[in-house]
């Protein structure tokens, strides 16, 4: 099998987001940074929001039309301040990307899960998306073309362990659907992307495991951050103007075929 190619970081000549402002959480590196690159490459003004301000500033410095902002999605005041900053900086808010997440609870046995780690993962991943969406919604509605895109996971649809992370990502499915119904009359679309395994800094030191997983994917490779960025750009753009409340799998065909991911991930 010849592996498919990753989506390009930018597409020359395409400016779907000219005059748009986007706020991206967890945008200092990995998928969030790739989304920031893609949206600025298509003309957007972007707030690179992250709990790690130093990394956010470094990412924003690479981009035209981007600024960094500290944002802790587990804190309502921090979220509201980041949204207000985006509007003050650029005069409007058109796109919110809920990308921040936590994956600290990693007990192999469910009964060994820690209460604090469980609560942290759900608070950042699921409730964080709620906080950001709540704060951004009035501004997105005012833009007349608002879009919310959250980053879920195939873990939200099928058992790949990581109990708390999976529960939080599954919660994003229902949040997306219920919010889509509420936001549609206000002209705001709400969608979700479910990535498979993506080559991000979270895998540093485990590159060998990524190579073992590649053949499990029907398209012959693990994903790249740019693959997710391309999907987000589509869902946030006018090209998806009649799409809301949906989940877009960007998983190389994994869930369609389910070719023994967990067995390979466990090293069997």
Give residue ranges: language-model regions.
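Short, small/polar-rich loop/turn modules that mediate ligand/substrate recognition or access, typified
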Residues: 145, 184, 189, 243-245
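Substrate-binding pocket helix/loop in short-chain dehydrogenase/reductase
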Residues: 106-110, 114-119, 213
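A short, exposed helix-loop element centered on a Lys and neighboring polar residues
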Residues: 133-134, 177
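Catalytic loop of short-chain dehydrogenase/reductase
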Residues: 149-171, 176-185, 197
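C-terminal substrate-recognition "lid" of short-chain dehydrogenase/reductases
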Residues: 133, 221-250, 255-256
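Alpha-helical segment proximal to the catalytic Tyr-Lys
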Residues: 138, 181-182, 241
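Short C-terminal tail/terminal secondary-structure segment
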Residues: 2-13, 107, 244-268
């Amino acid at each position: 099998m010849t592996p498919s190619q990753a989506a390009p970081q930018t597409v020359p000549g395409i400016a779907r987001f000219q005059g748009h402002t986007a706020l991206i959480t967890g945008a200092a590196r990995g998928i969030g940074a790739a989304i920031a690159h893609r949206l600025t490459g298509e003309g957007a003004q972007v707030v690179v929001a992250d709990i790690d301000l130093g990394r956010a500033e470094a990412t924003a410095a690479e981009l035209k039309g981007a600024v960094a902002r500290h944002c802790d999605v587990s804190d309502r005041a921090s979220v509201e301040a980041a949204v207000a900053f985006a509007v003050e900086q650029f005069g409007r808010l058109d796109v919110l990307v809920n990308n921040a997440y936590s994956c600290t609870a990693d007990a192999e046995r469910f009964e060994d899960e820690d209460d604090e780690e469980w609560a942290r993962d759900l608070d950042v991943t699921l409730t964080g998306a709620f906080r950001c969406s709540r704060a951004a919604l009035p501004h997105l509605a005012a833009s007349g073309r608002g879009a919310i895109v959250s980053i879920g996971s195939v873990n939200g649809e099928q058992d790949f362990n990581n109990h708390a992370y999976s529960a939080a990502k599954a919660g994003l499915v229902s949040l997306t659907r219920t919010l889509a119904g509420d936001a549609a009359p206000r002209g705001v679309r709400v969608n979700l992307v479910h990535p498979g395994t993506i080559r991000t800094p979270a895998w540093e030191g485990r590159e060998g495991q990524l190579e073992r997983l590649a053949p499990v994917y029907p398209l012959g490779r693990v994903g790249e951050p740019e693959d997710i960025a391309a999907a987000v750009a589509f869902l946030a753009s006018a090209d998806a103007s009649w799409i809301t409340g949906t989940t877009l799998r960007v998983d190389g065909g994994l869930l369609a075929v389910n070719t023994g991911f967990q067995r390979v991930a466990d090293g069997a």
